Amino acid sequence: MPWLAPLMAVSGIALAAGSGASGVAASEPATRQPSPAWTDGRFAWKSSGPIVDVGPDRSAPDPHIAIKDPTVVFADGRWHVFATVRMKSGRVDIEYLNFVSWAEANQAPRHVLALHSQYYCAPQVFFFSPHRRWYLIYQLADSSRQPPFGPCFSTTRRLADPKSWTPPQPMVTNAPAKPKWLDFWVIADTEKAHLFYTSLDGHLWRRETRLADFPLGWSSQQLALRADLFEASHTYRLQGLNRYLTIVEAQGKARRYYKAYLADRLEGPWRPLADSIEHSFAAPANVQLDVPWTDNFSHGELIRAGIDERMEINPGRIRFLYQGASDEEYRSTGYGGIPWRLGMLESQR
C-alpha cells in the first residue's frame, strides 16, 4: 500500500533482516544488558506503523478484512509468519508468508493453509527439537469431534512449504464435553511440555505432559493464574535470567492491552509485573506512535531468541509483533468486522 512505506520510515523501528535463527537483526549485537523493566515493570515502547495488512486479498472473491493472531520465527535467513485471516463471509483460516526484511513483509506472497473446512485459527509455530519437526498449534472447531472445539496440531519438516503441513490432529483427549478454553500455547522445560490457555473469565489454565509423550498425554487442567485478564496468553523463558514471563491480553477503557507476570517455574506461582492499564506491559499510555493508527494492542507475540520449544526471548532486546486497530475501527463494528493489521513494538528501555 502506498501509505505503508512512510509510516514505517517515520516509526524509528529497525525493520531489518535477521542474521540467523536467533532472530537478531544484522545491525544489533547478539546480547545486551537485560531491560530494567524486568525488575521495575516500567515498560516503554515505540511502535512501527502497520507493517502487514490484508494486502491483495482485500480483492479476493471472499475479501479478507483482517489479519491477526500472529506467530513468528526467524529460520534459514527469513522471517516466517503465520496469522489468522478473517474473510467478509465470516470464515477464518491461517495464512503464511515469509520474507527477508520486515520492510518487505507486506509485499510477500500469501498462502492460505486451508487445513480444515471449519473454524480454525490463532496459530503458534515452533521447532520441537526431540522430533526434529516443526509444529503448528491452533484452535479448531470440528462438529464431528468430542469436544468439538479445542487445541490441534499439524507438523512438517519443511517450514517454508505451506502445502507440507499434516492434517489437524487433536491434542487433548481427556477434556470435558464443553470445556471453556481458547488461545492455546505450548512451552517446554527440560522435562515437560506445558499447555497454557485462557477461558475468557479471568482464569489462566495449565496442563502438562512428559516431553516423551508430546503432543499427547496431557494431565488434567490446573489453575495457573486468576486475575483481571481475558485471552491470548503467551509464555516465554527470559534467556539468562532463569525466569519465565507470561503476557496476557486484558480489556480496559473499551480497549485491548497487555499485562505481564513472572514466575521462577512454569508451574508457578505467577506474580504481577505490569498488571493494570495504568502500569501495563503494552497499552496506549506507554507506547509512542509517531503516526497514530492504533489504540489497541491485542493478540501478539514476542520476537524469540530461537526457534524451539523453550520459547526463549532476549531480555535485552524486547520486540512485540501485535495486532492493532484504532478506537473507531474497534468500536464501530462487531468483533468479526474489525480490520486488524500487524505492527511491531520495540522496547525503549
Residue ranges: model-predicted function:
Residues P2-A17:
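Bacterial N-terminal signal peptides
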